[in-house]
Amino acid sequence: MDAQLLQANKRLLRRAANVRQRYKMLATESFVADIKQILLRFIQKPNVIIMYISVLVLFAAHIDSNTHDILDDLAAQFPNNTFIEWAKSNFFRICGALVFIPVIIDTEEKHRNYLALVIFVFLMGFPQRSIMEYFIYSISFHVYAKAKHPVTRIFIIGAAVFSCVMFGIFTNEQLRKLYAELPKVPTHPVAVNRVEKVANRASRVSTEGTVNFG
């Protein structure tokens, strides 16, 4: 029985590797295949699965009214600890940070600090979001960092903006104000002078023509 189970696991791993390789070959031809091979490789990693399961367990313990989660226990043991009090009031930020950890670990070392800084600003600069939103944003960050097809990054940026509007991070009124505050593109002075000269010349011709015909 153990030998059969081992063989079955090997077949599944071999099949998954073949699928990932096929998507990797197609990544340069299709941005959909690019996204598929990135997600397939990412989700198969044990540290990613363990971290996501840990976040789900932490969230389940938090929403269970009959169970005190670990933050409640720590707050009872250390009532004057400001960090624990902050963590209790920022529970979803903590979960979001845990969700983003696999993304930071999986990125290239030369980009790791930069990505960690961007994620820190995102977590602390915006109001707390739901765990599902943090999961979507973490996947978006990962796909953007690993993309090989040029259209993939454009698609991720568009999807991220759409998600921010849909989840209420940016409202339509805020987007309109942002658009209104964008600097206007200045017109080149030479072009302005040429336009003014043409307009003045046309005005003089029109005036002279009117006088002559009068």
From Swiss-Prot:
<dbReference type="GO" id="GO:0016020">
    <property type="term" value="C:membrane"/>
</dbReference>
<protein>
    <recommendedName>
        <fullName>Uncharacterized protein p24</fullName>
    </recommendedName>
</protein>
<dbReference type="InterPro" id="IPR032441">
    <property type="entry name" value="SP24"/>
</dbReference>
<feature type="transmembrane region" description="Helical">
    <location>
        <begin position="150"/>
        <end position="170"/>
    </location>
</feature>
<dbReference type="GO" id="GO:0033644">
    <property type="term" value="C:host cell membrane"/>
</dbReference>
<keyword id="KW-1133">Transmembrane helix</keyword>
<keyword id="KW-0472">Membrane</keyword>
<feature type="transmembrane region" description="Helical">
    <location>
        <begin position="43"/>
        <end position="63"/>
    </location>
</feature>
<keyword id="KW-1043">Host membrane</keyword>
<feature type="transmembrane region" description="Helical">
    <location>
        <begin position="116"/>
        <end position="136"/>
    </location>
</feature>
<feature type="transmembrane region" description="Helical">
    <location>
        <begin position="84"/>
        <end position="104"/>
    </location>
</feature>
<keyword id="KW-0812">Transmembrane</keyword>
<dbReference type="Pfam" id="PF16504">
    <property type="entry name" value="SP24"/>
</dbReference>
